């Protein structure tokens, strides 16, 4: 089952992306480097819950 997740910026800007992931094949927390338009740099985004 694919669950929706929120990718929060580690730069502390409050910017986020939403995506989904398969929890059976990826049980660990998701981390990826993406572009943060607020600071205009590539930063790490970490998985968080959608409220």
Swiss-Prot record:
Entry protein name: Large ribosomal subunit protein bL33
Q: Which organism is it from?
A: Psychromonas ingrahamii (strain DSM 17664 / CCUG 51855 / 37)
Q: Tell me the protein family, please.
A: Belongs to the bacterial ribosomal protein bL33 family.
GO molecular function annotation: structural constituent of ribosome
What are its GO biological-process terms? translation
NCBIfam families for this protein: PRK00595.1, rpmG_bact
PROSITE patterns membership: RIBOSOMAL_L33 (PS00582)
Q: State the gene name recorded for this protein.
A: rpmG
| Keywords per UniProt | Ribonucleoprotein, Ribosomal protein
What PANTHER family does this protein's entry cite?
54S RIBOSOMAL PROTEIN L39, MITOCHONDRIAL, LARGE RIBOSOMAL SUBUNIT PROTEIN BL33M
Return the annotated region ranges for Disordered.
Answer: 1-20
- One short Pfam name that applies is Ribosomal_L33
């Amino acid at each position: 089952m694919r669950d929706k997740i929120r990718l929060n910026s580690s730069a502390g800007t409050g910017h986020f992306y939403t995506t989904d992931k398969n929890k059976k094949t990826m049980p660990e927390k998701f981390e990826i480097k993406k572009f943060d338009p607020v600071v205009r740099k590539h930063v790490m985004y970490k998985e968080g819950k959608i409220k």
